[in-house]
Amino acid sequence: MELDMVPVTIESLAIRMMPQPSVLSLRPSKALAIPGEENDEVYDHVLPIWIGPAEAAAIASAIDKSRSERPLTHSMVAQLVRSMGGSVNRCVIDRVNGTTFYATIYVRCANGMFTRVDARPSDAVALAIRADAPLFVASNVLKAASFPRSFKPGADLKLEMEEFHKFVEGVNPEDFVTEGD
C-alpha cells in the first residue's frame, strides 16, 4: 500500500547532550509539493522528532558535508549501495506510535527492483542527505504528530528560531503521544 507522502526539508536541528534529547524538526516543502497539494494544511506545520546526540551529530555532519579520515556509517552505507549498482530512491517517515517514529528506506537495486529497509528516522535522514535522496513523511504522521508552524513570512528568522528553541526546551517527548497510545 502506497502512503500519501509529503516532501519535507530540515527546519532545524537542536543538538543537546544527555539526558536531554536532541530535536530534529522537519517542515513540509511547498517547493517540492505536487502542484495543487501545496495548500494542504500540513504544509504550514513542523514535525519535531526527538533523537539522541550521536544521531544528531551524524545528521549535522551530513548537512555540513563534513569529511572524516575514515567513512562514517551513513556515508559507508550510501557508498555500499552505489557500489552494488543501486541507489537510495527515497526515505519515508511512515509511522508513529506514541513518541516513537518509524522510517523506511527505499533502495533501487541494480536490477531495477526496489527493496525496503526498516530504519530509525534519524538514520533515514542522515542517509538521505548523504545519498542525495528525497525525504518524505506520510501525511497521516504529519497530521498526528506535527504542530502549526509559528514562523510568519517576513519575520526575523533568527528571532523565530530562538523562540522555537525555547519552546523545544520546555517540552518532553511524552507531550506528543498520539491518540490510542
Where do the model's predicted regions map?
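Divalent-cation
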Residues: 1-181
